Amino acid sequence: MEKEKLKKKLSLLAYRVTQENGTEAPFANEFDDFFEQGLYVDVVSGEALFTSLDKYQSGCGWPAFTQPIDKGVVKEKRDKSLFMERTEVRSSNADSHLGHVFTDGPLDKGDLRYCINSAALRFVPFDQLEAEGYGEYVKYFS
């Protein structure tokens, strides 16, 4: 999608996060403390990224997930910004900056913590999956 169209479609924060590799403030974002059942999709493309089943309270200040809905929906990239080395997470289809993945997650779930900016996500409640075109993901919740 063209940058000008994206600027009109997204909030200023969502644009800064997804297109300019920004980071929203910790603990003051939409999904850090949000635990309803449903699907988290890329705010740019609508691509399904994470389910509420894999979300947990990590205490980091951003939504944290143990894994994406499918390994192919995200891509990882080495990030050497801010005088440290991390692994950036981007959406596969829209190439949106989502956040970072760390190896300090729950050991019983594979020890990964996908630390994702709320501004990069849109939440689709479980009871609206079919209506919004995400019916194929209902099976994840049974």
From Swiss-Prot:
Disulfide bonds: none annotated. GO terms for biological process: protein repair; response to oxidative stress. The keyword Ribosomal protein does not apply. GO terms for molecular function: peptide-methionine (R)-S-oxide reductase activity. It comes from the Bacteria. It catalyses: L-methionyl-[protein] + [thioredoxin]-disulfide + H2O = L-methionyl-(R)-S-oxide-[protein] + [thioredoxin]-dithiol. This is Peptide methionine sulfoxide reductase MsrB. It comes from Lactococcus lactis subsp. lactis (strain IL1403) (Streptococcus lactis).
